[in-house]
């Protein structure tokens, strides 16, 4: 229905792209895998990868389609919300945001702030990092509300901040990172949506402002399609779908999705824009991998440095202990009436160095 079928093979696609110098230059700079993604899109084998920032933000653009992001966030939060504004990342306190492949911050109608983030390298996004992102959202809101209310500021004017993180892959076989293992703990089972907030072990009920919603998209792919036929299943299915065959099945189940896939297929008529989006996504992935590898290397260096320092400390401890033993031996030999010369000979046998033996006798005799 929405598959273009304009091109019969790769040569046909590349001939078409070559008519657009900007798109052609970008396309020729791609690695083979990314060229294949572009080719598959134009050949109607694959849809656009919506989990990448440029594609997600285009399809969920709040100026053009104000309802889509509202519906997605509503489905995740389990309550109806309305997105009223998309915020910029320019005033964020966190400058190391490059490990995300998609990041969008919005304000809801009630004043609360939500960030929707998609992470491809799950190991690079541990709980500590999520905590910092949430704190950044809260402080951003605090500054805005305080500046607006000035002398009338009251903490009760602050609204919730929701941190939504969608992990593309949480396969525990690929890494022993805590975030992977957490998603696949036995007690978790096949659950793919996890909601967390601050609670007290005594049952004390206080409502804090920071909520977390974590989604494992790979777990959803395994079990989600068979779950209840609800709004959340529909939107996550959209994000998880890669082929037009699956897209057609989705549209049979959710007819309202046909508009989205029609829009996706229309980009085939604008190669400069679609190849540009692929280029932007590729750059983000390269930056992600660079920063991830840099972080991994730094962590490895710090670990090795710590091991060296521990070994040095152990060596120093051993040296101190051996000095104490030599001192005790020398004192005992003195009591026994042993001569310096014989003591030097005895110690030289132990430490295999006559010079060292002489220094020890000089020090402790």
Residue ranges, per PLM feature:
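Short hinge/gating elements
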Residues: 52-60, 217-224, 246-250
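Charged, alpha-helix-enriched surfaces in structured cytosolic catalytic cores
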Residues: 64, 68, 125, 230, ...
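Short, charged alpha-helical interaction segments and adjacent helix-coil junctions
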Residues: 2-44, 114-119, 237-365
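Short conserved micro-motifs at the rims of enzyme active sites and ligand-binding pockets
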Residues: 175-178, 224-229, 276-277
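Short, solvent-exposed polar/charged micro-motifs at secondary-structure junctions
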Residues: 92-98, 224-226, 259-260
